Amino acid sequence: MLQTTLLALQGLSCMNCAQRVKAALESREDVHHAEVNVHYAKVTGEADTHALIETIKQTGYQATEAQTPDVELHLSGLSCGHCTETVRKALEAVSGVISADVTLESANVYGKADIQTLIAAVEQAGYHATQQGIDSPKTEPLTHSAQSQPESLAAAPNTVPATNVALATSTVSDTNTVLPTNTALPTNTTSTTSTADTASATSTAPVINPLPVTESVAQPAASEGESVQLLLTGMSCASCVSKVQNALQRVDGVQVARVNLAERSALVTGTQNNEALIAAVKNAGYGAEIIEDEGERRERQQQMSQASMKRFQWQAALGLLLGIPLMAWGLFGGSMTLTPETQTPWLIIGIITLLVMIFAGGHFYRNAWVSLKNGRATMDTLVALGTGAAWIYSITVNIWPDVFPMEARHLYYEASAMIIGLINLGHAMEQRARQRSSNALERLLDLAPPTAKLVTDDGEKVIPLADVQLGMILRLTTGDRVPVDGEIVQGEVWMDEAMLTGEPIPQQKSVGDIVHAGTQVQDGTVQFRASAIGSQTTLARIIKLVRQAQSSKPEIGKLADRISAVFVPTVVVIAIVAGLIWYFFGPQPQLVYTLVVATTVLIIACPCALGLATPMSIISGVGRAAEFGVLVRDADALQQASNLDTLVFDKTGTLTEGHPQVVAIHTFNGVSEQQALGWAAALETGSNHPLARAILQRAEGLTLATASQFRTLRGLGVSGEVDGIPLLLGNNRLLEEQQIDTRELQSLIQQQAESGATPVILTANGKPAALLSIRDPLREDSIGALQRLHQLGYSLVMLTGDNPITANAIAKEAGIDRVIAGVLPDGKADAIKQLQAAGHKVAMIGDGINDAPALAQADVGIAMGGGSDIAIETAAITLMRHSLYGVVDAVELSKATLRNMKQNLLGAFFYNALGIPIAAGILYPFTGTLLSPVVAGAAMALSSITVVSNANRLLRFKPKQ
């Protein structure tokens, strides 16, 4: 029974000692894997503890079973087995840790690691940890409910007021849909408390100010498990894919197994044992290995790919070296029919052909034999049967010619050699094309530099990327690529984030800003603190997401798989039936015609093209999308996105900038704009309210006076004195209660409200001094992107919790067709359902937090996120750059990918539907000739090359401007 044993080691002084112990342990047949450092050995296998200790003693060291952990942590926030597994992996990823035993409440850590680094690793995984016996302050959880309370716009310093959402009862156009207020409001609704509560003069109801909606970081469900990638060998066609996938799916703990023929890999998700996965693949007749380290796995995959290509090249050369001269001999007048004079030369050629078949085509026969033992048929079965039948017939004629009539003594040695040569040549060209299709993922992998510059007390030190730990201070200078995610603690830089987000314009970063692994410094120098390393970085998550998507299948691909599963047995039956028809009803010599027809049918059928049609398009399409900053979680999203007719947009943060700005200042009674802005900012100093921040942001650079006699006027605004001048700042009702004449302002107030802005009024000495127009403006590229989507034929809808007047104004400016306003997050999913019930194929575009229910309900969810956990985990498609042109790229690329997929599938089906009947001799009554097995072999190789080459066209895809 497979078990893991942890041993404490004594006497080791360096990693050479550790390697010696590791080699000794792994030399045992009952040890599958050993992980060793100078303190511990973690051994997986069937060996008992005593035997392992004796093995270590033989190397000159001592060992005992590890029982006392080096660090004990108290855990909180864990609720299931998936949580404990996540924390265990996070702890064991810390440098120096060899093993961690994790329960729902505690973790025993074995290894030499800093306690704070261990705690940080747990926090990074989304849970909480403190050292056993120490009551440390509990950090903020990643998943939380925002319990903000309503607050004045001019709140006291260090308070965070609630966000206000105005739901006015104004009449809107017929294109708007206003959901009833009583279905949209939470139960803890309170009255307005700040200047944000300004409503238009036409409003007849008090403005409602709901509390913020609960925000949460999307955590993977416990049932999702962890993903592991296997590198596979021996697969040749879609039948192999089906066999391996079924074998993996039957392993205990496996939830999802995705096998990729193009990449020769499998992505398995679940709680399975890795050794069991490898055993399952081997029992199915194929090879498999698991390499955890990304760099090592990539190197191994490249080595396997290069080795395969070289092997196919020399095998093709060997087959063609014999086949081409033989074929040329026959084409240019030489006799391919055996005579008594040529029996010996042809026998020598037959033996040479056999050697070529063994050395250049041995893999076909070995794989076919393994397939037969496992009760299945693959492409190798077809090749083995076809070439084997041709050679056996020829050698039989060669040895016993008298058994056959003269007209049946034609030899087909050249067919066996040429078929093997051509198919190997096709495999070599296909391998080269597949390498090109993986370039997008390779470029992502290349973004992470191999080293990092560590800042120490003794100066700067270059360390390997694998040695970077959480909390380390690292330095970046011009031209450097960022090794890990982190927060800038000193300096300022311009960052090129194009490869990560698709955004071509350099971004300025300074203290407090986050830098992401893989981005590049264009100018400047900074120091930053590592906050995410290894598989936790944004880049690593993107790579994982791309790999998962490339291994997934859309519905159209699953249809191809179902056909492929029965394809080869069907072809064998067709070959037998066709051969029998020619044997019993064909012209003389029937035996020759039977052999030619059966062999040609077997050779021309190409399940390989069918198996590659979908995965090659997916690999190219998903990879190209990643280069545009469009992350696809599942290939089925591409198929769904290609069928959309309606795009639904959230307003705040999607169509708009996401934060209010002062867009205009109107002054009265001789007050200057600068003076009015200074007074308003003085009253708002210390407030964190979004509208207060907008005023303070507009006043940056001004010298502000100190406000005195400050008062918060609930639901109205604020008052105070600046330089002895009494000031009021708030909504229209504030001025009415203070009996200040606002008749001259009413038309302007109405105009601002209708344009979607919030009018905030400032008075000085009892007279209007200024009206500040505050609104959340459209993003610079929103109008252009929406126009492009209109040109592509999409219906555009805005779905927002904002009031209808503001929503309608923004929609009119943006060019939105329809507005659904006054909807809180829990009602957005229902709005999507209504659109779907009307027969629309709907995509929801939102920020991935409050829009989560709608993103899940939509046919395709598209999250606008800068690579955050929330955005990546919520939607089927994530846009890494905050631009609506990413939506344009996503829908155009999805259409191009599905079109390419259909072309490949149609080509593969058409090729087989046309080729097999021709090979069976359907044209013989009209032409008097049969298709040569050699031509069939060339056609088979060409069909696979065509599919791969067509898929690679996606790598050059560019969205239309």
UniProtKB/Swiss-Prot annotation:
CDD domains: HMA (cd00371), P-type_ATPase_Cu-like (cd02094). Cu(+) 3 binds at residues 237, 240. It is an enzyme of class 7 (translocase). It catalyses: Cu(+)(in) + ATP + H2O = Cu(+)(out) + ADP + phosphate + H(+). It is a multi-pass membrane protein. It is found in: Cell membrane. Cu(+) 1 binds at residues 14, 17. Mg(2+) binds at residues 847, 851. Residues 131-153, 178-201 are annotated as: Disordered. Residues 3-64, 69-130, 226-289 form the HMA domain. One of its GO terms (biological process) is copper ion homeostasis. Residues 142-151 have a biased composition (Polar residues). Cu(+) 2 binds at residues 80, 83. NCBIfam families: ATPase-IB1_Cu, ATPase-IB_hvy, ATPase_P-type, PRK10671.1. Belongs to the cation transport ATPase (P-type) (TC 3.A.3) family. Type IB subfamily. This is Copper-exporting P-type ATPase. It comes from Yersinia pestis. The lineage of its organism: Bacteria, Pseudomonadati, Pseudomonadota, Gammaproteobacteria, Enterobacterales.
